[in-house]
UniProtKB/Swiss-Prot annotation:
Compositionally biased spans, kind Low complexity: 12-30
GO MF: DNA binding; DNA-binding transcription factor activity, RNA polymerase II-specific; zinc ion binding
Chain intervals with Basic and acidic residues compositional bias: 110-119, 669-683
Residue ranges flagged as DNA-binding region: 61-90
UniProt protein name: Cutinase transcription factor 1 alpha
Keyword annotations from UniProtKB, A to Z: DNA-binding, Metal-binding, Nucleus, Transcription, Transcription regulation, Zinc
Amino acid composition bias (Polar residues), ranges on this chain: 142-156, 704-717, 737-755, 865-878
UniProt organism field: Fusarium vanettenii (Neocosmospora pisi)
Amino acid sequence: MSSGDAPPQAQPQPHQQEQPNQRQSSTPAPSAAPVPPAPSTSTSNSAGGVSFRRQRASRACETCHARKVRCDAASLGVPCTNCVAFQIECRIPNPKRKKTQGTGGSQTNKDSDSDRGDGTEDPSPRPVAPTAASFAPRTPSVFHSHNGTPPTTLTEAQARKEEVDSGTYLDLVMKPKFTRAPITEAGRVAYLGESSNLTLLVHDRQGSADVVHYPLPENVRGSRARLTELDNVEIDILHQRGAFLLPPRALCDELIDAYFSWVHPIVPVINRTRFMRQYRDPKNPPSLLLLQSVLLAGTRACNNAQLMDANGSTTPAALTFYKRAKALYDANYEDDRVTIVQSLLLMGWYWEGPEDVTKNVFYWSRVATIVAQGSGMHRSVEQSQLSRSDKRLWKRIWWTLFTRDRSVAVALGRPVHINLDDADVEMLTEDDFIEDEQDRVSEYPPDPIHVQFFLEYVKLCEIMGLVLSQQYSVASKGRQRNAIDLTHSDMALADWLQNCPKIVYWEVPRHHFWSALLHSNYYTTLCLLHRAHMPPGGSARFPDPSPYPSRNIAFQAAAMITSIVENLAAHDQLRYCPAFVVYSLFSALIRHVYQMRSPVPSIQQVTQDRLRSCMSAMKEISRVWLVGKMVYALFESIIGNKVLEERLQKAEGKRHRKMRQTLTTQLEQHSRQQEAPKRKYDEMAIDFGTNTPQPQESYERSRPQTPSAVKAETSSMQPPPVSSPGARQSAADTFMGGTNSRPQTRPATPFNPSFSVPPTPPDLYLVTRNSPNLSQSLWENFQPDQLFPDSAAMPAFPNLSPIQTHASLDHSAMGPVPGNGQGGMPNQQAGQFQQRGNGILPQGFQGHTNMWQPNLDPNLPEGQSPDSWSSTSGQGQAVPTTLNVEDWFQFFGINGTDPNHLNLDIPLG
């Protein structure tokens, strides 16, 4: 128990929620959480009542045996602790000696799930009568002296557990039949990694070098040993937290339905078929910890008025379920490791204060990953003895952890936790979402839209991780920044968009919630990538030498995010979005504030409309996510405040200036190398074979393929890279050709006048990628407008096809293009630009085919650098890059505001 949750003494007032006769107002849906009797300070039941000794048993009771949990009826008598806690009749089955199978009482042949084993569903279960046996309350397992000195002796239960644990390794190594036995409880798996010395002994004896998952011995129950010793203090704390309470049946049903409709597709970590079967079975209910966590996540998408406060927010209800789930977790109430991982992931749906570094979404997702890796979820289970349905569930859980790891790292500016070099879990397939079992067909077949959404979301999250490592990691600041990292990331994103299945491909005329959510994450990744390369704004004294249109791409991506949000608002679906949509809107708002500096009045008007749309959406989202209220208040202070707007706009260019200086240095070094005397064999045409050194690539792309249980399939999906005849080992010469580019490299274009690219695409190895490598056509003819759908009609992009050589370039055509006051291009340069498609423009683009010009900023005053701060902003402070709202308030010099007292009734405009 955490010290903050456990009161030092029991409170004298009665515990209303603990009394069975008062539980009718919150009747639970299943029997998973009947309220245990309130701990009493007296051993007698009532005045004049008689206390009876427990009847001792020689074996586990029926309930504990059916659920495969530890039963203490043999040591403490009937009723056991579990039956007392859940007010279930504690019955010891009669011994059946040498009887045929099928007559042995309640034991069932079941396929274990993360949510414990499933019992056979009884369509008409008999009502459970309360136990007639009295019980003596459990005394605390640890006694505290008056002076606070801890005890120095073990209790009987602790000594018994220590004796059992001492033989765990012996059971693993010396029982061959045990290590090869089927794993019937997926939540009780021992993982042995390769570096463990114990692995040598197990593999040497069993000869199973590819197996890393083993069933835990039956006598090892993990934290369950502590659960059976919950004393009065711990039970009292759980009662005070309401951990055993559930909403009325109808409301519980509604919350669970909302969870599986709006949350489960994003975090598909529960086998819905088994969960619902247990939910309807009072004799074999689901884990109480998991159920409270599901209810927590369900509040984020439930519209029931019973859950809302006066402002229409479900935050108080979410906090209630969060505290209940957290109390159960802190008490070690659950010992099924997979159930714990599932619950920890869902506890991250309580996300209110991103500036809090403990018990927020970052904390819970990291703890879930640690528990999962402790059970070996990061390793392939294809060779394990898990059932097929459990193997599928484990894969879904692992890749869900991966998506949470990347998205939380992006939103909060934290380092990633999962290194795919340490994992060999195969990429998900459509079959992994099937929940059919060997003897029954699932009543919840997978939704194709949900399946494709998550598959594409996993792929997008890997690219998101590449952007983080290459553009925002600490290591990226210390190494030379290669322009090819930017183009490679863009090509990976363009390839993702081109291969996105039509069923989840979002366009304005074809709105769907899951496609909209998927593509909002895609455009947020684009903003993240190109924000690191955005110039501070053109001026006569500081022209931008880079021809890559990062600013254009970032602005267009922000416009697409706004368009998606407008469609979600029109369909009344904003409240169902996860918390990451706050970060997406945050990114779009920053881009819109930055674009307000355009001297073109029409662009300013369109940008103001977008700001209004984003602020309106943020206001609506803040009813569900408190962090949205913080961002809303922040931009209410920024918009219209010229000093704060200028501070944000100027700070954007600091990072770009560093990158630009690095590129300039690289170009100068390359130019000097080209002017140096050629070596004797430099002009010889050398044919590099496939075994010769390949051009240097970023670490995450060049690493070898992770081990896979099905190597043949992987190799068929990932063709070996083709070596370029003109390739050189030098990283600089791989993409910097200058005027003396080597033969058979792509000629320079207006898009990349200083860079020439190898004629064959690099091996962009992505673990989640199950399509062929980048096509030759995409590599040779890539244009930034391929980052957007045809219907987006990305304006004012140069024709980037390789139509001329670097030597014949007209450098005057690559300079800043002034606006003509109408958002169009001058006639003499119109031929150098093309527009893709004739589709529908995003909302806010109609009538503006060229929404910005390279020179957005008016000339700055003499002596004012575009990378410098305004006179009122101070020097040296870096612009925040995450959702830590407290950092943003400090950055703008705004006095801290209590988010619980923010006024959301400010008119927009």
